[in-house]
């Protein structure tokens, strides 16, 4: 048997007809190829040797005639007259395109042998399959159009929303990634938190109603995560690798993609634009949420030789299959920069609300005033003690939101967010806030917060305040605790501070010394900077969680479980007193031994451990900040101004920003040019020069009157001290929280140090800035800056 090569048909199409005829012509040719494949070889030979036209010649002739009737023979004005398709010439007399000789494929090139084992289909079955294929494509097309036309329904108030009217896929079918991408696109045009939460809630409800098994993947992608933070799973792809994937997927050069990225400042927009200008003959299967999520996890697992190439190819396969706005949001997800004005907390709130509408298990507790608000609160609270979507989401679906606290508990081996303290400016303020309440004061150590889990199998896991796994960084800590825990202790979770310590001089060393230690795979024999563990809380002991117990009980459990060894493991130095003079002396003593100040905690009233919360039941008092704003702040340099005079050649001042967690944006708060030694200024200028970008990020909020000379990628975190905070018409920090139209700025900011232990998104939040402003003793309307601050 012989069959027509479809690829050879298609190669001849461009030389036979204009671009508008291609779709008509190609479908005819595919049908012709199947019909001719059933002709016997002998019949073909007779037809070719006969003086009459062959079957192929007749079919081609008919196709040309049909194409001429459907499309007028006019000059193609849609492309440049200087550009010609391959195999075309320009007739000078007629001024129209004609097919040059030799461009048609030879008959033998159009025929290829078919395996004898293949059973030829009848013409009827061939035509029937063509119809099915066409119907499937039409159905896919209509499903996409239907989804785009319906996506606006997600903006309805949840009470008025019907998931069945929104879904464009059958129950049990995988959720299309386009659905999530279109929902993201809808959110991108909104700024109100309530509207954004409603859209997310309705999106999640639609997934629950159709394909609940896809909910975990949908929640992870919405939160722009691929795994729990403590697992340390990251995509591990740089911008250059993503650029390569985009260029190869969409037929662009890397230089072209880089140029567009510089112009647009958003690789997602570059990917979307590249896809929109690319035509494809054969469309891959549409992406699903699960396909994207599973591929992300596969990318994260790639390691070793050629891992970057493998990651790039996986990304490319996803990009090739994208359509509409999918390239934009797929690329941003790959960059872990979704930037849609909502955070993981918003996703949790939406998840809780979606569960209420899907609730089939139980009714809300009696006297629940607002089930939606209560459900959102429950999911957020559960996430603080068990931050694992893979556990929470199935529990939510099977047991309901009201039972979630019973089914999802604090678990050994899964770190919780640390309880944090609010700043205060003096001992008198402490006594005023803690009237008639027993409280204790502890030294505030200048080290690295650590949450240490000791498993029942005898292994340790050490986590940072951000749930990063630091076990390999502190092997000496694990050895010390193994030696000093009492035999009765089989498992525990310890909250403590790991501090650099000189054992010969019996002296606490500054944080800067601690930061010189290697961060991964540390060998005990190579350690040059020793550390001491200062323990102040016990959250779990021998299978029993203690976070609901008051501090007095937790601390007793701590003291009973370990032996102290000075320089290796010590309990935080503490005193319980409400005498103002005694507390002042204790504060001075803490500073003398190298501590930052004091942490003041309620002892037996309102004294439970509140995970991931900056609580009024813990206060911090820093000696250096009693005459300023009460605390230092951690800010991100997002731009700079060229230096003049003796600072020529370096940056003379930097524009700093705080971070708004809910809006996912950096908001300008001050310019800083003081606190730098010449060496530090050179170092910071050199470091940030490699982070210069052409235009500010879309998620930077800066006043119109500020015109920096250069903009930076948000990469560094600087600890800054200031005299006070003021309302500012120039800066955008906390706009809308204290003043509806104006932001907050720092007066007389001074750089203290670079915080290498923090990511930009972990900088001081706009909400914290507002809290500091409101806590100022002299807070009055005249405390306002009319112009720019230096």
Curated annotation (Swiss-Prot):
Catalytic activity: ATP + (deoxyribonucleotide)n-3'-hydroxyl + 5'-phospho-(deoxyribonucleotide)m = (deoxyribonucleotide)n+m + AMP + diphosphate
Pfam families: DNA_ligase_A_C (PF04679), DNA_ligase_A_M (PF01068), DNA_ligase_A_N (PF04675)
Top-rank taxon: Eukaryota
Binding annotation for Mg(2+) 1: 497
Keywords: ATP-binding, Cell cycle, Cell division, DNA damage, DNA recombination, DNA repair, DNA replication, Ligase, Magnesium, Metal-binding, Mitochondrion, Nucleotide-binding, Nucleus, Repeat, Transit peptide
Residues annotated to bind ATP: 442, 449, 465, 601, 614, 620
Active-site residues, as the UniProt record annotates them: 444
Cofactor: Mg(2+)
Cellular component annotations (GO), alphabetically ordered: mitochondrion; nucleolus; nucleus
InterPro entries: ATP-dep_DNA_ligase, DNA_ligase_ATP-dep, DNA_ligase_ATP-dep_C, DNA_ligase_ATP-dep_cent, DNA_ligase_ATP-dep_CS, DNA_ligase_ATP-dep_N, DNA_ligase_N_sf, NA-bd_OB-fold
Keyword DNA repair: yes
Knockout mutant characteristics: Lethal.
Binding site for Mg(2+) 2: 596
Segments carrying motif Nuclear localization signal 1: 68-75
Function: Essential protein. DNA ligase that seals nicks in double-stranded DNA during DNA replication, DNA recombination and DNA repair. Involved in repair of both single strand breaks (SSBs) and double strand breaks (DSBs). Required in the endosperm for embryogenesis, probably to repair DNA-breaks generated by DME.
Alphabetical list of PANTHER family matching this protein: DNA LIGASE 1 (PTHR45674:SF4), DNA LIGASE 1/3 FAMILY MEMBER (PTHR45674)
Entry's family note: Belongs to the ATP-dependent DNA ligase family.
Protein name: DNA ligase 1
